[in-house]
Amino acid sequence: GGETSCETMKAGLNLGEYLGAVVDSIATVCHGPSAMGMQEAGRIGATAGQSKTRADLVVYWGSNPLELVPRHMSRYAVYPRGYWTGRGRFDRTVITVDPRKSITSENSDLHIPLMPNTDYELLSALLTLIHGKKPHPSVEEITGVSISMMEKMLQMMKNCKYGVIYVGLGIASSYGKHRNVELAFNLVKELNAHTKFVISILRGYCNAAGFSQTASYLYGYPFGLDFARGYPRYNPGEFTTVDLLRERDVDSALLISSNLDAYLPAVCAEYLAEIPIICIDSFHSSITLISDVVLPGVFDSIECESTMYRFDDMPIYSKSIIASPFDFTESNEHTLKQLFKKTKEIKR
């Protein structure tokens, strides 16, 4: 799950490698396509502090931060005063690309109301325009956005001093999936020929970026790692949670801080309820109700020290505020290490 520490994730990966299991994260039903697109295109990024200090143009593409992460605009992106943005919101231009009207689009300077599932076509048209060519007129009918509006948006992006695009699930879950994200990252690379531009992913959980970072560092792949052959294999669509459950290839599951059944298709959730489940969680949820064994979780960064990745992929280390309330475990990492030790003893 995305609400546990990187140390716990590392312990889970080590346990999965020893057992020859498949280890996956919540990214598989969330921002997995974003991680795939990032690995395809490469990323030009920056810390949240750099964007706060420098950015005079903010683009929210397929995201609605005022409802998803309400503090994002006020703390990092739009309203705070930075060194080169001393007047806060008055020194910034905000563009929202979203099929629907939202609170974020109402508070933007420009709203691009594209048709649903046409992110790929709009990004392709912008890349065509940035290369000095005209896109095919049919793109207006497909995307619902006029070429003149695209040109206006592109000019705003090229003329800014420092721009940042925040992509959300809207771009990663529409038709095209990771190819949409790949084009967005390529657009940012092309914009850097004209000005300074970076891109960031808006995630929902406190450590949603942590598993991708930890797994990529240790094994080279961001999610969906299969250790059945003794070494990591990666093939989204085969070794990922939804596909394994749909094909009924899983005979048991260990879930850590993950209310997984809330995000799964009905067929997968029904099969998940049929197999043995061990759950480590701090909250009562639908997954704890169907689990065979429930181990109480420890609140990372509150009841134990931990490391978590911020939305801009910066690791944040936190000390504990209070001690773990349990005498049998200090943290979720400690729980997994105890399970790992017992597993080794049994397998011997």
Question: Predicted segment positions?
Answer:
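Short, conserved secondary-structure transition motifs
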Residues: 195-215
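Long, structured ligand/cofactor-binding scaffold of large enzymes
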Residues: 1-45, 49
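Non-catalytic alpha/beta scaffold blocks inside enzyme catalytic domains
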Residues: 28-196, 218-348
